[in-house]
């Protein structure tokens, strides 16, 4: 068990007990722990200092600004100005600076983070470098993920997880880095080696307020002092701006950091794909690089997944793998759970479950699946409650324009009235009377699949891998994959 004298973390502490663990949650405190009491969006940890002490905390560090009366105790209570901003550094020191001992890949962007990190991790495993994962689907190693609630965990959990992965044999970690995490300093003390940008489109404006603020949060990762390489998408406006910013830097910066770009459209990119042939089995494309032309093969569906694959290939090049070595493993790489995941097909409808919950992501999924729909292309979607209301009609516009039939249902209503969410979505349709609105996601999925033809393709968008539905603040067991499997099994009987 790791322990550290308190003085190694706070030199001015009144006493110097051995610290066994760090925690932000008073309920998880055990004897010997350091409780870090900070104000949060919903709960102020400083109000729970007494609880932490009762549970055996060896010391408490708390945010000094705005602190109220503290309990009387012999346990060290350490006031710290700006504690939240220092959490990542404190945890890094406690856990032995694990990011310095790993090839740390940070992937950011509106869509594609999960796919790219999983592709990178699978490829590195196949190439002999064990790679850990931190992201939307959880933390751990590929195929053995422990689920979590946040794309990027809190600053303590991030450092602790990196340390656990290192001890578990990881030499690299592919990590999703959300705009929230960058803005809130959750990864502030990490030493990223590679920064990857997938794309930028409308999302999280309920938090950031504007696209400019959202972009500024994402851009922070590409100014990281420890970077060896930036990987950017030239098919995206933000990616082109990052590349232009890099080109304007003093040449001395380019000695320490290089830039690799990828594109399906621009021959100027470091990795440029042309002559892509898409089929039900995936894609075969010509890859144009400074090393000459190669053939890239992938089993993933869709043009946007080819872009994700290019991001992964560029990342592996940044980690000094040879291109020919990389291209030997790309045909083996699989997509993540709930990302363009296929069920059915053959003599029954093809159902595709995808996490697409932004207008841009939904557009890419529907465009990718249109060639596979030999009948009609059907789309089911909803919009999450307590999130950006402005994107709701935009989702409707995309679905109506690209699908033959649209059904709107609940996503995660959270604390919002589902009917109000429907009301926000409806104005995005030019022909709302042609659209089905069905409350109850399970019922909606069953209805859409039951009424589909065998040669139709059905997109269930928005929830992907999620195994719950959040209603009135409570998470209920629910899975699009499970509901689709049940509906496909029921579909066989009347059509047999």
UniProtKB/Swiss-Prot annotation:
ATP binds at residues 109-115. GO terms for biological process: cell division; cell wall organization; peptidoglycan biosynthetic process; regulation of cell shape. UDP-N-acetyl-alpha-D-muramoyl-L-alanyl-D-glutamate binds at residues 24, 26, 151-152, 178, 184, 186. Its main location: cytoplasm. A motif (Meso-diaminopimelate recognition motif) lies at residues 411-414. It catalyses: UDP-N-acetyl-alpha-D-muramoyl-L-alanyl-D-glutamate + meso-2,6-diaminopimelate + ATP = UDP-N-acetyl-alpha-D-muramoyl-L-alanyl-gamma-D-glutamyl-meso-2,6-diaminopimelate + ADP + phosphate + H(+). Its EC number is 6.3.2.13. It comes from the Bacteria. One of its GO terms (molecular function) is magnesium ion binding. PANTHER family: MUR LIGASE FAMILY MEMBER, UDP-N-ACETYLMURAMOYL-L-ALANYL-D-GLUTAMATE--2,6-DIAMINOPIMELATE LIGASE MURE HOMOLOG, CHLOROPLASTIC. Catalyzes the addition of meso-diaminopimelic acid to the nucleotide precursor UDP-N-acetylmuramoyl-L-alanyl-D-glutamate (UMAG) in the biosynthesis of bacterial cell-wall peptidoglycan. This is UDP-N-acetylmuramoyl-L-alanyl-D-glutamate--2,6-diaminopimelate ligase.
């Amino acid at each position: 068990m790791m322990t550290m004298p308190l003085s190694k973390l706070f030199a001015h502490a009144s006493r110097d007990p051995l610290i066994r663990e760090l925690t932000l949650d008073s309920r998880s405190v055990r004897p010997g722990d350091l409780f870090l009491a900070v104000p949060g969006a919903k709960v102020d940890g400083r109000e729970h200092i007494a609880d932490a002490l009762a549970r055996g905390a060896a010391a408490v560090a708390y945010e000094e600004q705005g602190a109220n009366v503290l309990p009387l105790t012999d346990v060290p209570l350490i006031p710290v100005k700006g504690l939240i901003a220092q959490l990542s550094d404190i945890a890094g020191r406690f856990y032995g600076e694990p990011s310095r001992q790993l090839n740390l890949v940070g992937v950011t962007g509106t869509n594609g983070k999960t796919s790219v990190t999983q592709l990178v991790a699978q490829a590195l495993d196949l190439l002999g470098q064990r790679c850990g994962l931190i992201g939307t689907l959880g933390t751990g190693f590929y195929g053995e993920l422990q689920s979590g609630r946040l794309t990027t965990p809190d600053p303590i959990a991030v450092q602790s997880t990196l340390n656990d992965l290192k001890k578990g044999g990881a030499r690299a970690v592919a990590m999703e880095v959300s705009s929230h995490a960058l803005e809130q300093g959750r990864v502030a003390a990490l030493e990223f080696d590679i920064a990857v940008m997938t794309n930028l489109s409308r999302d999280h404006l309920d938090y950031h307020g504007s696209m400019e603020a959202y972009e500024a949060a994402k851009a922070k990762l590409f100014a990281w002092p420890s970077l060896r390489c930036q990987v950017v998408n030239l098919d995206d406006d933000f990616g082109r701006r990052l590349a232009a910013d890099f080109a304007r830097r003093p040449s001395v910066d380019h000695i320490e950091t290089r830039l690799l770009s990828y594109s399906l459209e621009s021959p100027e990119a470091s990795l440029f794909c042309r002559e892509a042939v898409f089929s039900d089995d995936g894609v075969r494309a010509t890859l144009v690089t400074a090393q000459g032309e190669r053939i890239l093969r992938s089993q993933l569906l869709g043009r946007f997944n080819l872009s994700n694959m290019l991001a992964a290939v560029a990342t592996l090049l940044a980690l000094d793998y040879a291109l020919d070595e990389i291209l030997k493993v790309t045909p083996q790489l699989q997509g993540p759970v709930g990302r363009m995941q296929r069920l059915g097909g053959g003599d029954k409808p093809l159902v595709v479950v995808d996490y697409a919950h932004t207008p841009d992501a939904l557009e890419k999924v529907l465009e990718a699946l249109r060639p596979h729909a030999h009948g009609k292309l059907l789309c089911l979607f909803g919009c999450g409650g307590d999130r950006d209301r402005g994107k709701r009609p935009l989702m409707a516009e995309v679905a109506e324009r690209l699908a033959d039939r649209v059904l709107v249902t609940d996503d995660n209503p959270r604390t919002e009235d589902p009917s109000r969410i429907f009301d926000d979505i409806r104005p995005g349709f030019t022909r709302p009377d042609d659209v089905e609105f069905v409350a109850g996601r399970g019922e909606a999925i069953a209805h859409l699949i039951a009424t589909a033809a065998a040669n139709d393709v059905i997109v269930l968008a928005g929830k992907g891998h999620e195994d719950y539905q959040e209603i009135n603040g409570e998470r209920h067991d629910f899975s699009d994959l499970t509901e689709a499997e049940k509906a496909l099994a029921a579909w066989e009987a009347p059509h047999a």
